[in-house]
């Protein structure tokens, strides 16, 4: 068996091409040259036709003058000789074949087949150009024939000068068009040059400063779009740097603790080392397992955040009732001492199934974590209008203070009271990211306003539609909320109580 192997492909050669400036300038020159050529031909044709028509009119007028004067009949020889003092050649042929001629010096009136046809009476009139002369032949009523011609050399001299003038003017026009096209192209492509320099600067120095925008034309819009790209790139780098910094900080603590415990276990197992009490060994092993679980959770949260930032998601129809059921089953396995009150309607969201499941699970985990043993967690999915439904997860825990409500959706934020609890500070940040990516909004309320404890209710509004086999009336809108900024203390709520905080996709994206 003979085998063939394809050799390596030759690298593609970069084809050299003219710059945009040269292409625009050559295009302008070509267009101007085309217009100049067309106009030159038109001018030449019009002037040439006018000059030849004027010669024909002169010959016709001279013939009519001779005929009308009657001199051709009274004294034809004298009448023809009189034309010698003008700029025409003349010939009179009588029926008896007597011929009278008068020519200009150095010229002879040409007689060809058309003129002979007029003399024989076959044609009444003939006009033609021959031997640098314009010849007119007319058959008269008395049987005579009058032939008159005029030299075209003066006319041809004028046409020669006209051709030279048109050629010079056309050449100057093309040259001016080239210079003007180059100047206009240079001025018009100056913003493109600035964009090129900015792109090279970004690639060379990571400088993401915006480019000044001049005017309001298409190039100005291109500059604005490039500035938007620079801002998005700067924000992406800032998020990446912040994520790496925060992740490193959050990973350092469990890794240090895990390393300490592992080293202690390894040291106790070396020959001759004192043995740790069994109770301490069990505690160390439990700590190691707990720290590994904490690291796994933290890494999973970081992966989810990175996945959401990159937009690598697959959108599909998602049944939120199934999402709630699956998430609730997982939470119940971890907290079987909590009572869950569930009221769910059929609702379909077109989005990321994994992201929506993670958001619902994080809300339920958060509510279960802060609920005391034997506490109750409410889970309610209700339809608000034909295109929106709301998932409300509430608990009867200690609640969230108004000052901290503005920070709980930020990455790695953990309140003072939450630092003693397990968690990475990424759960609600993931919820916020998922909700905003689906065009929804979040709202935090007290479960029991003014209660002790007040509890926490997190409301997740999602666009979608009822399931095909569901028809649920819209729930009454019994609570009014005021959207406020969730970025920190600088965006304080206008209401002093700050009992409610909300964030939606539009306000978040506007930032």
Curated annotation (Swiss-Prot):
GO terms for cellular component: plasma membrane. Residues 246-466 form the Histidine kinase domain. Its cofactor is Mg(2+); Mn(2+). InterPro entries: 2C_sensor_his_kinase, HAMP_dom, HATPase_C_sf, His_kinase_dom, HisK_dim/P_dom, HisK_dim/P_sf, Sig_transdc_His_kin-like_C. Residues 48-163 are extracellular. Keywords: ATP-binding, Cell membrane, Hydrolase, Kinase, Magnesium, Manganese, Membrane, Nucleotide-binding, Phosphoprotein, Protein phosphatase, Stress response, Transferase, Transmembrane, Transmembrane helix, Two-component regulatory system, Virulence. Member of the two-component regulatory system MprB/MprA which contributes to maintaining a balance among several systems involved in stress resistance and is required for establishment and maintenance of persistent infection in the host. In response to environmental signals MprB acts both as a membrane-associated protein kinase that undergoes autophosphorylation and subsequently transfers the phosphate to MprA, and a protein phosphatase that dephosphorylates phospho-MprA. This is Signal transduction histidine-protein kinase/phosphatase MprB. Autophosphorylated. Residues 1-26, 185-511 are cytoplasmic. GO terms for molecular function: ATP binding; phosphoprotein phosphatase activity; phosphorelay sensor kinase activity. The modification Phosphohistidine is found at residue 249. It comes from Mycobacterium ulcerans (strain Agy99). The gene is mprB. Pfam families: HAMP, HATPase_c, HisKA. Residues 476-485 have a biased composition (Basic and acidic residues). Residues 468-511 are annotated as: Disordered. It is found in: Cell membrane. Its EC number is 2.7.13.3, 3.1.3.-.
């Amino acid at each position: 068996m003979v085998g063939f192997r394809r050799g390596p492909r030759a690298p593609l050669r970069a084809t050299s091409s003219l710059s945009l400036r040269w292409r625009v300038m050559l295009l302008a020159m070509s267009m101007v040259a085309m217009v100049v050529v067309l106009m030159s031909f038109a001018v030449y044709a019009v002037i040439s036709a006018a000059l030849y028509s004027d010669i024909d009119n002169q010959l016709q007028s001279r013939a009519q003058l001779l005929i009308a004067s009657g001199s051709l009949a009274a004294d034809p020889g004298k009448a023809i000789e009189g034309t010698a003092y003008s700029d025409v050649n003349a010939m009179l042929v009588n029926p008896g074949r007597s011929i009278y001629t008068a020519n200009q010096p150095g010229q002879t009136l040409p007689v060809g087949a058309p003129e002979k046809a007029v003399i024989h009476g076959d044609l009444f009139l003939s006009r033609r150009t021959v031997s640098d002369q314009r010849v007119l032949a007319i058959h008269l009523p008395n049987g005579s024939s009058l032939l008159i011609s005029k030299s075209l050399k003066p006319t041809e001299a004028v046409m020669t000068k006209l051709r030279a003038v048109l050629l010079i003017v056309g050449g100057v026009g093309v040259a001016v068009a080239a210079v003007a096209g180059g100047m206009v192209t240079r001025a018009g492509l100056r913003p493109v040059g600035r964009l090129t320099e900015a792109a090279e600067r970004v690639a060379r120095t990571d400088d993401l400063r915006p480019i000044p925008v001049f005017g309001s034309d298409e190039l100005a819009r291109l500059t604005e779009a490039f500035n938007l790209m620079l801002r998005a790139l700067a924000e992406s780098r800032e998020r990446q740097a912040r994520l790496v910094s925060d992740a490193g900080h959050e990973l350092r603590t469990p890794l240090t603790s895990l390393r300490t415990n592992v080293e202690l276990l390894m040291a106790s197992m070396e020959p001759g080392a004192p043995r740790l009490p069994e109770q301490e060994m069990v505690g160390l092993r439990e700590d190691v397992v707990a720290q590994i679980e904490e690291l796994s959770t933290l890494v999973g949260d970081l992966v989810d955040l990175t996945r959401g930032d990159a937009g690598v998601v697959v959108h599909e129809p998602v049944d939120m009732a199934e999402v709630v059921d699956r998430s609730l089953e997982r939470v119940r396995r971890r907290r079987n001492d909590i009572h869950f009150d569930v009221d769910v309607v059929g609702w379909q969201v077109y989005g990321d199934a994994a992201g929506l499941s993670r958001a619902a699970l994080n809300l339920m985990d958060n509510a279960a974590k802060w609920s005391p043993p034997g506490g109750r967690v409410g889970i309610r999915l209700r339809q608000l209008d034909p295109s929106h439904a709301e998932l409300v997860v509430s608990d009867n825990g200690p609640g969230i203070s108004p000052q901290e409500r503005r920070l709980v959706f930020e990455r790695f934020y953990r309140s003072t009271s939450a630092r003693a609890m397990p968690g990475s500070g990424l759960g609600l940040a993931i919820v916020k990211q998922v909700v905003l990516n689906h065009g929804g909004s979040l709202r935090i309320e007290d479960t029991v306003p003014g209660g002790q404890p007040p509890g926490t209710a997190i409301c997740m509004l999602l666009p979608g539609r009822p399931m095909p086999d569901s028809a649920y009336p819209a729930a009454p809108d019994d609570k009014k909320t005021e959207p406020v900024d969730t970025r920190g203390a600088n965006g304080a709520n206008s209401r002093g109580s700050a009992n409610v905080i909300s964030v939606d996709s539009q306000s978040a994206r506007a930032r």
